[in-house]
Every structure is written in structure tokens, then in C-alpha cells.
């Protein structure tokens, strides 16, 4: 997620330069750009619409006392008529050692879960937890440490005791191939299964060109993408996976939309049929080396996801809006019109 501003600026610039390097040197000129543009051609099928499996990331204000009952009522009205089923509410972050002082950082967690269950009984409230991680971030969480993984599991169980309907992890930036990340997913998933609730993750983007994650690390010392193989390994360990398909450094809306279409196709190929797959929508505005507001639009992401989905009848596919506190009425309208409204 974009909240990790301490590391994201430099890393985003370096990975953007890696993408430019790939566009210009290892492949024939503009081959990758042309490929992305071609992914954005054609018309989405009429069947590529919401299946009632969508989600939205919610900020920390919902659990720290800043929100009121009136805000919950307004949220229910905003979500009415959409395909949103899951709310990922920021209940962390976890401490670097995996612990969570829940009473201090999320004192209104129980109030929020109770309020949502009353106002929106068909929705699930998942606790969004995570932290920056080693080796990408100094002093981050060490997921290779078994003691840290134990504390992450204990913290997750404590959060569920506050009425949450699932755990949604966002550990960043996880390098492709990380065994510690897979291990913590295995451990926490075993716990959530005993509690009868889902384990969900926010996932890195997949390599838009084979081996690009290795190139990014070689050039900058930082990774951004996951190999398709590793994405599949993660997906097999969870109940739901949401691709953070934004902050791409792409300069044009057509290239960004093609990127989302490609990401959707790649993710569909390796996500088990029983696992929910969601594609992230950039419901925020910013201009920096990793994100062009004029290019990364909700409309382009929705159209790209629909093109990537094609005529698939997969029911457990959805879109996820990031993030409620930055989303404008125009963002919500683009989601509703592009994804929720019937063609014709």
C-alpha cells in the first residue's frame, strides 16, 4: 500500500527506471509498451461485470475513535447497490516483532465490527494488518524469524476476538520467492481455518515481462514484482488474494489499462478456482515517479480488468477500491458505471 512513504519514494523511482530499462534495452524498442496497449484493445464482454465479490480498503479512522454511528450509516448508503462484500479496515500496523498493542492502536475495533454487522449484515469486516519487511526495509519485520511468525499469529487471533470476519495481510515489500512470507501464511491460515474465517492478502504485481523482478533487484537492489510462479504459491495458501494493481510508473491511461488487463490474465492463470481473486483500483490522485494520476484511473483499471477477465464465468472474481479516505465521488461513479451497471 502507498502508506509506506518512508521507503516507497526511492524504491518507486528505481523500479520505474528498471521498467524504462526493460522497455528500451532487453526487448526490441517499445515491444512491451505495444504489448500492453494491445491488451487494452477490443470491447469487454457483457458478462464481465460485478459478481458481488468486490472489496474496499478502509482507513484507520474507523477503529481509532474518529468515526461515528453517522459515518457507518453513510458508508452503508455509499455501498448500497455495489458489488462490495468485504471491508478491509486498517487495524494495525503490526510492530516489527509481530506483536500488536490492539487496545492502544484500535480501541474502537469492537464498536466498528458490531456497527457494520448491524448496519450491513451481509458484509464481511476483515482486519487489515501488516508492516514493512526485511530485507527491503531496515528495521522492518523479519518474516524468516519463527518467533516473529508466532507473534503475528497470536496478534491475528487477538484481532479476530474483536469480531472481525477475517484477516487481510499487507506485508510490504515482500520479495518474490520469500520463504518466510509463505511460512507465516501457512501458520496463520491454519489458525483462521480453525476459526472458520478467511485469510486474505494484498499481493504485489506479477512480472509484466519474464524475469523483470530479478532485473529490478540487480539494477536497484529492490524488488517490485512477483514471478507468476510465486504468485501462485501465495494464492494456494490463502482464501482471497487482492492484487495491488496500481503505482505502475506507466505514463498513459491506455498502457495502464493494458497493464491491468495483462495482470488480470496472469493472475487468473495461477489462482486456484476456490480462491477469491480481486484486482485493485486506484481510487486516489497523486503524481510522482511511480504513479501518474492522469494515467492510473479507476475507469482504465475497471476496463482493463474486464478485458482480462474476458468471458470467464469465474464467480469469485472482484475489484477492490483503494482507499476510502482518498476516493472521490468520481472514483465511485467510475466503479459503479464501469463494473456494476449492466451493458445497454
Language model: regions and residue ranges:
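Extracellular glycoside hydrolase catalytic/binding regions
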Residues: 174-178, 199-267, 290-307
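Ser/Thr/Pro/Gly-rich low-complexity linker/stalk segments immediately outside membranes or between
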Residues: 31-54
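Substrate-binding cleft of secreted/luminal carbohydrate-active enzymes
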Residues: 28-38, 85, 246-248, 269-344
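Chitinase-like catalytic core of GlcNAc-active glycosidases
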Residues: 47-72, 78-81, 90-235
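A structural motif
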Residues: 84, 161-164, 238, 314-316
